[in-house]
Design a protein with these regions (language model features):
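Formylglycine-dependent sulfatase
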Residues: 1-365, 369-410
Length: 410
């Protein structure tokens, strides 16, 4: 059951704009059949920002739309429709809005005026200097501990690139930064609308990402051709590459798809002025993960998670824990264990311990991610009893949840 389905049953209006990526072949999988009243966006996982078309085209509610005319940019359009859905609401019922930007997912496409804001800094400084500056700033802000080391670096140093390579890869990063910049602008636009219409103070806002930065197709200098950047016909590559993905994930190891911190550790920003006003600017370092979003929203709204749905079918019980006890400093732990699996990248966390089986590795690894957040020191040989326990717990979870490909449903 989706969050939208639960909240709709509890008297909420439910709106969505942006990237669905939860089933596109068969209308029964589309947002309006999964609890949303209104939807504008793409059903696929990626699209052209400038001219979404074909299987990666736009849908309004249950209607496929024609290719939009220029000028068009998905980030702006998704925000405009999100505001429109809320603005068209005529009653005083509460609303749930899910705004899922496709940015900064590939392809690299951004507004020229935004790109120009970033071309100079990335060309002049390069990824080594940018990476170090980000670590220093994160330390100053209290995001990471002062003694945090960099994870392994998988690429050449900036001064080892040719001048032509520097030109091209710096431009890729500038376009990526422009995509993020446009997200920032549009989040502010949405919040300004809510504030102007006196809805912001009593609105719980949660801003998060689904994974770490993306290195696909895992080439140091990026995928696709620089000449393809801002080509409206491109809906997949070009991308910004492995090196810049590692910079984006400073100081962590690896990137999207992998179960190291660079793949799974992302920030969550929470704002709820009427209920969390005394928490402004506070850090919460208690680990949580995506299954916690549903129970957090249930606690905030008073909605009830059903035992049956879709014609009386029994559904899986609620997974996850509300984040509010952690946010309110009432607990320092939400889970005994947390589990991950994506494309055969596996991980489990238990307290300070994290066990990982990487797609490229032959053995499970073990890290103390409180002392070693960047996963530099594999402690599997020093603590075999801990590793054995965690692998057994992961296998138990995987079997219970039919995790593929190692655990096919029987």
């Amino acid at each position: 059951v989706t969050i939208a389905e639960v909240l709709k049953e509890s008297g909420y209006h439910t709106y969505m704009a942006g990237k669905w990526h939860l089933g596109m072949h068969g209308e029964e999988k589309w947002p309006l059949q999964r609890g949303f009243e209104r939807f504008y966006g793409i059903l696929a996982g990626a699209c052209s920002y400038l001219r979404p078309s074909g299987g990666r085209g736009l849908t309004l509610d249950n209607t496929k739309l024609p290719v939009p005319e220029a000028p068009y940019y998905t980030t702006d359009a998704f925000t405009d429709y999100a505001i429109r859905f809320v603005d068209e609401q005529k009653d005083d019922k509460p609303f749930f809005l899910y705004l899922a930007f496709n940015a900064p997912h590939w392809p690299l496409q951004a507004k020229e005026e935004d790109i120009q804001k970033f071309t100079k800094i990335y060309r002049e400084k390069g990824w080594d200097e940018i990476r170090e500056a980000r670590r220093k700033r994160m330390t100053k802000l209290g995001i990471i501990e002062p003694n945090t080391e960099f994870a392994e670096w998988e690429n050449r140093k900036w001064n080892e690139l040719t001048e032509q390579e520097k030109d091209k890869v710096a431009y890729r990063m500038a376009v990526y930064a422009a995509q993020v910049h446009c997200v920032d602008y549009n989040v502010r636009k949405l919040l300004d609308y809510l504030k102007k219409n006196r809805k912001l103070d009593n609105t719980l806002v949660m801003f998060l990402s689904d994974n770490g930065a993306c290195a696909e197709p895992y080439a140091e200098l990026g995928g696709g051709k620089v000449s393809e950047i801002n080509d409206p016909a491109c809906s997949v590559f070009p991308s910004y590459g492995r090196a810049w993905a590692q910079v984006s994930n400073t100081p962590f190891r690896k990137y999207k798809c992998r179960s190291y911190e660079g793949g799974i550790s992302t920030p969550l920003i929470v704002s709820w002025k009427s209920n969390l006003k005394n928490k402004k600017g506070e850090w919460c370092r208690v680990p949580g993960y995506l299954p916690d979003i549903m129970p957090t929203i249930l606690e905030a709204t008073g909605a009830t998670y059903p035992e049956t749905y879709h014609g009386g079918n029994r559904i899986y019980p609620l997974v996850g824990s509300s984040l509010f006890p952690a946010i309110q400093k009432k607990t320092d732990s939400l889970h005994e264990y947390m589990y991950w699996e994506h494309q055969n990248n596996r991980a489990i966390r238990w307290g300070n311990w994290k066990a990982i089986r990487d797609e490229k590795g032959k053995e499970w690894e073990l890290y103390d991610v409180v002392k070693d957040r960047t996963e530099r020191n594999n402690l599997a040989e020093q603590h075999p009893e801990v590793l054995t326990k965690l692998v057994a717990e992961w296998e138990k979870w995987a079997n219970a949840n039919f995790v593929l490909p190692k655990h096919p449903k029987k």
